[in-house]
Amino acid sequence: MSKVSTKKITSIGGSALIEGIMMRGPKRTTVCVRTGENEIYSEDIKMTTIPEKCKLFKLPLLRGIAGLIDSMRLSYKSLMLSADKAVEAGEVDEEEPSKFEKWLDEKFGDKLVKIIMVFASVIGVAIAVALFFFLPSFLFDLSAKVVPVFQGSGEVAVFWKSVFEGVLKIVLFLGYIVLCSQMTEMKRVFMYHGAEHKTIFCYENEEELTVENVRKQIRFHPRCGTSFMVLMLIVGIVIGLFIPVAPFGIGFLRPVFKILLLPVSCGVGYELIKICGKHDNAFTRIIAAPGLWAQRITTKEPDDKMIEVAIEAMKAVIPDDGTDILNNK
């Protein structure tokens, strides 16, 4: 899949939410949620980013780490806001709380949501670490008992272990989002994701932001979170080539080392995304291709109502002074 060449490139990005979209510009971040047939709720979100607190995180590689953390913080705030508004508007059904849930609410009150989110985050991180770091290493060690080329601790074994682990991580990641795409609510989120990309492309092509103009745009964008995740996994394969099969003679340390080097994968992946977004040549097309292919899963064709929400969010964050434009072609 080839990249689409646009007349200009914007720094504006966003994310799909529950019945809505968040758009983030250089001066403003806005969440827009569909709350009725002809109603769109809009609210700005304020957040101090890590680079604003510490100039050091504006440097290459470090800015990728900061960007990922800030994106996760912003996505959480946006998602909670969109979920609340969608439930209030009846766009998403709210189930009757169980006796246990009522007891928890009486016991912890307003702190309940924070407690649940912290608990869920800890469990989620633990599962992710087990699946993406320790499981691939464990399965490779099992395979090494029957695959001769996997055996030993030399350069050949390191190469195959890195490739094996990396490919398995990509399969797990793609399998996860394929399963998510089968859920009704996630299908709609992926449709809003498509609307977000199409709207950004429409703006970059210097076309008026109308439903008709947005609808005809392509939904695969090189500066997407999906592409970033895929690039991180690929960079992780390369980094794995420099980690011994059993550091200091202890096989358990290899996944630990890979976890410690995760910020490097994040930083390099971020820089590659920025390069792919600014330049269109054979090199960047090769780098961007895996992420664009993965977007066939994480983006779907939106309906006109979704496009209207994306346009509303986009218009809210476009600065009057053009400070969002990275370059003009």
Where are these regions (language model features)?
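Divalent-cation
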Residues: 1-87, 91-95
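Polar-ligand-bearing catalytic/cofactor-coordination segments
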Residues: 2-17, 21-23, 91, 155, ...
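Multi-pass alpha-helical transmembrane bundle typical of ion/small-solute transporters
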Residues: 52-55, 65-68, 75-97, 101, ...
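Hydrophobic alpha-helical membrane-embedded segments
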Residues: 56-81, 165-190, 262-278
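Low-complexity, intrinsically disordered, cysteine-poor segments enriched in small/polar
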Residues: 64-71, 75-78, 82, 145, ...
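Hydrophobic alpha-helical segments characteristic of transmembrane helices
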Residues: 92-147, 157-183
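Transmembrane alpha-helical segments and their cytosolic interface motifs
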Residues: 111-130, 217-242
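Juxtamembrane "helix exit" motif at the C-terminal ends of alpha-helical transmembrane segments
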Residues: 125-151, 232-257, 270
